[in-house]
């Protein structure tokens, strides 16, 4: 079984490879009657699109989305929505050496070990190029949850964190790092530039907050909202860790310090803290849902690395091609999309079980 789908009721399947003719997504379970056009999806793809600054890969992809099915006269029909994005700037010749040897840190060896055959061009299915399809699907998911606002940003690159005292949401769209701290963004220019010029790469942390999520979404035990979010975020290329709320910091706290006290509010409780990240017992509390996602440094670097060939012989490999010096930067729209996809699914699940 090949697991290329995600979700329960609001479900999507992605298809395509980095150097194939196109990639895309099929969204199933979307309610009928929602206004949907390609123009509504495009801004989210534009935010993720490569080649927009020297701090991302220089692969030039317009990422123009086409809706092939599931929409009639500008409204969803309730049938599968097929979305397609053409690949137009592949340079497969850059990957000739990768056909014979495994790139350290990439999925090359693991794919060969599992399937006995792999598309080595740009990583094939394991390439972060696949995330364009998720972003398109996430734009559709947002239509299902108009009451929810989702915002993500880069909070750390190469160990250099933002100062939350300088947080300005409006700043996120003003710089190429999706950074809410203009002081940090200025530092990151040199940090990422130095990595790019030396042929190295840097890791990053992306934070995401969803506000407007009502209490009651999610389920206990094996279908927890936080488990669904962790599943979604860990499925993003290059992600190596996920925290909900305070995450690992909770292990260094006390019961008193980690609790989220409440007092009476206007019809709903007023929380005095949000260490839990808006989720308790796997169910949303009505507080903002908060997630942090750790992206590893891009494995494609210009330093020759020891590896082996498909025949098991020792060799060295220098990765060619066009790559992100910090893949976490373009991870921001992807994290937002996965948050939207999970929450749209959870809303429909809750409605089906509880009628809310």
Swiss-Prot record:
Pathway: Metabolic intermediate biosynthesis; chorismate biosynthesis; chorismate from D-erythrose 4-phosphate and phosphoenolpyruvate: step 7/7. GO terms for cellular component: cytosol. Its EC number is 4.2.3.5. PROSITE patterns: CHORISMATE_SYNTHASE_1, CHORISMATE_SYNTHASE_2, CHORISMATE_SYNTHASE_3. PANTHER family: CHORISMATE SYNTHASE. This reaction introduces a second double bond into the aromatic ring system. It catalyses: 5-O-(1-carboxyvinyl)-3-phosphoshikimate = chorismate + phosphate. GO terms for molecular function: chorismate synthase activity; FMN binding. The keyword Metal-binding does not apply. Keywords: Amino-acid biosynthesis, Aromatic amino acid biosynthesis, FAD, Flavoprotein, FMN, Lyase, NADP. It is an enzyme of class 4 (lyase). Reduced FMN (FMNH(2)). GO terms for biological process: amino acid biosynthetic process; aromatic amino acid family biosynthetic process; chorismate biosynthetic process. NADP(+) binds at residues 48, 54. Its cofactor is FMNH2. Homotetramer. It holds the Pfam family Chorismate_synt. This is Chorismate synthase. FMN binds at residues 125-127, 237-238, 281, 296-300, 322. Belongs to the chorismate synthase family.
